[in-house]
């Protein structure tokens, strides 16, 4: 990657300049305006969220990273250790049928209707969960048209995190089924709303798993996984947002060198900078 940093710098410079030109043509007042419009959110709301998350870096993400480094026996936790499993994590796997029952029962405790909608994804084969050669990594829920059901894709390996992923994507799926009732023009939703539905479904399942934990060790692993999930969902995204804001502001002053781009990323990192 180091050998290609000039290429990466050229890509960043080109994309940032291309956006600046389009924003100027569209009379966008800031580089962020277009994204705020597509997300149906006011700039003031985003800024308030950003400030609250950044203010919480030391007492949340920094504190957790220090704890995890201690648990892993590390003096300094590197970025590749961020999502590493804890040494006390159980190797026991959760089979697909058990995962289905966990998610559906968690949904049913909140809303039987929500569980019934989610159940269709299993009974009608709307989910592709098996790991297969050539299959794309990751997970997503994808609507098609309002007259056809959505699909869920994930790679289920049987870990508790995979159960959380299933619950997350089914949250999207249930939302997409219900949104289809609004018709083709109104069923599409911005990310801000879509992720609210998915994280809500995930939290329902997490609370059920936590309540069912039999040992302090099991609770610790679940809670650590949830903290890491929230750091990935919220803290990391704010760091990306800050990096992009700083990058576009710097690019407006002229072409950037690899070192200048690296400095933008280092400055906005949510990790401690002692």
Cite the ranges covered by each PLM segment.
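Conserved small/polar residues in nucleotide/adenosyl-binding loops
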Residues: 1-2, 267-274
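Contiguous, non-catalytic segments that form substrate-binding/exosite surfaces or channel walls
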Residues: 4-151
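Conserved helix-loop functional segments at active or binding sites
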Residues: 109-116, 142, 172, 176-183, ...
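Short pre-active-site segment immediately N-terminal to the catalytic Zn-binding motif
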Residues: 153-166
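Catalytic glutamate of the conserved HExxH
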Residues: 165, 169, 173
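Post-HEXXH active-site segment of zinc metalloproteases
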Residues: 176-197
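Post-HExxH zinc-binding segment in Zn-dependent metallohydrolases
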Residues: 191-215
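Long, well-structured alpha-helical subdomains associated
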Residues: 207-266
